[in-house]
């Protein structure tokens, strides 16, 4: 078979590991031929691609980012987009398409599959919020990066008797905030699944000061809602999928904490550092397992389905199920946060 791959949406540690494993097994086990479209769906529309061979994928599983680059192109919103994709795939004699991406990218994959394009998906997001899978590659790396930052913030906050608010990624789900906050010993952990109670936040920080610890570390996910200001948007511009760029909840929260408590408060936004750099060993292994299953899905003609992790097994579900809702924290995780908080 002649198979095409692409990566869409934000980059993520482990993408290259998926590409590496899919191509390696496809060539060695199935005798496939591969191309990689550059810059996501934009590359398909522009017929812009590179060959993927055993030689030019050698060692890429160790690297961060994506060798295929990426974009946030929404084929569904481009007049004649679906027809153009079908034309390009036909010109290049493509038998199947493997799309690596989050819910936005996979919404396009599903659309194409429903319109006769043989395609399968691989879930990609550091937010770990794709429905139906226990963990996405890239999440472990993001948590490691965020945890290291929280560790470092402790010493500088302590040295200056300050409160420091650390803003991490997480538009709809607080997995990174939860994991890095717990691992990093944050005094306050705030996630999008629950509205921020500023009085409770301030009470927790005051408890620290009243009991001899004259500093505080707060971890907050970018998608959190603060009743006093709502959801903080970094830009009024939206991408082709209608998403505004979230940024600034950390700064808004820091200002409010300082105003209500009188404690000197600073904010740090970790931003894109969370999805940069080389993937952890766990994400390299997980990414390759996703890639191996993806090429098997192609040969089993499981069109319109997406690879997922269930327990210790890689299996697959329909893309429609995967993007129907976000995988979010529930009461079990709220209880962990509450049990580790000071009792105020």
Q: What is each residue range found by the language model?
A:
Residues 2-10, 66-71, 96-99, 164-167:
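Short glycine-rich or small-residue beta-strand-to-loop segments that form or flank ligand, phosphate
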Residues 96-101, 111, 118, 139-157, ...:
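Accessory alpha-helical/coil subdomains and C-terminal extensions
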